[in-house]
Amino acid sequence: MGDTASVSEHHESPTVTIVPLHRSHALVAEQQLFQWLKRFKLLMEVYHGLVWQLACTLTVCLLAWLAFPDVQGQCANGIVPALSSIVPVSTLAMLRGFAEFRPHTTNFAHLTVACLLINTGITVCTGFCGERRVIGLSFALVMVFFVLCSGLTYLAGNNPTRWKVIGIGYGWSVIVFYLLLYFSPVLWVSKIYSGLYVLVVTAASAVLIYETLDLIYQRGTLSKNSVCVSVVLYTIVMSLLNMSVAIFSGHVWVQQYAEKHGGRIDGVSLLSLL
């Protein structure tokens, strides 16, 4: 009996701490609130950086265009039409390459300055080649596109059903647009440029949706870098803006090219103006 009592003294039952249910709910709610505030702060930093970069670019462009109002519209034989489509897309590819393969050794502040200088310079040149009303229309359409695409991304989120509805609706809209464009009485050159614009918008939508979903749900380490995300979104906007101006001004450049070459223009010449 004595041995049994001594054993029972040494083997005490473990203590169990019971957390009240209301306290556990409070801890979970506190953690969720902290995560939401952290994500909201990141979103504000990203879009603040985007607005700042767009404001800098547009200010420089307006000053350059107003300082030289007579330099306008004669670019059919130059390289600006091609560069206006190639350079912004190349900077976007460069950004994604650095972000994916060299995220820890890349100074994104320096990369932001480089992208600002490159995209601002090519936008100034594109503005000298395009008409002012075309630039204004392109910028308005790009802003509407950006707000609409971002809003749909926040609305759909990770819900596959919502994305399926959006995809089906957009697909049918594109089909109807191409049918109307095919049977419309406009010139074939305008049909080509209009069809290309739909493809450009579709590609830009896919890239913007992908980047916005990364930002919302922070699916990778790069999405937590506000400087990197803001410059990527800025480059998407500038790519679409420059390509919109190039496409909307394409028929004017084709006409200028034809006038300088005796009314002759072939498919290779047309592609060189894209």
Curated annotation (Swiss-Prot):
- Bilayer topology term: Multi-pass membrane protein
* Predominant location category: host cell
Is Signal among the key words of this record? no
Keyword Transferase found: no
Top-rank taxon: Viruses
Bilayer-spanning residue ranges = 49-69, 75-95, 108-128, 134-154, 168-188, 196-216, 228-248
Q: Which cysteines are joined by disulfide bonds?
A: none
Q: Mention any one GO cellular component term assigned to this protein in its UniProt record.
A: membrane
Q: Which UniProt keywords apply?
A: Host membrane, Late protein, Membrane, Transmembrane, Transmembrane helix
Q: Localized where? A: Host membrane
UniProt record similarity statement: Belongs to the cytomegalovirus US12 family.
Name of the protein this chain belongs to: Transmembrane protein US18
Q: Which organism is it from?
A: Human cytomegalovirus (strain Merlin) (HHV-5)
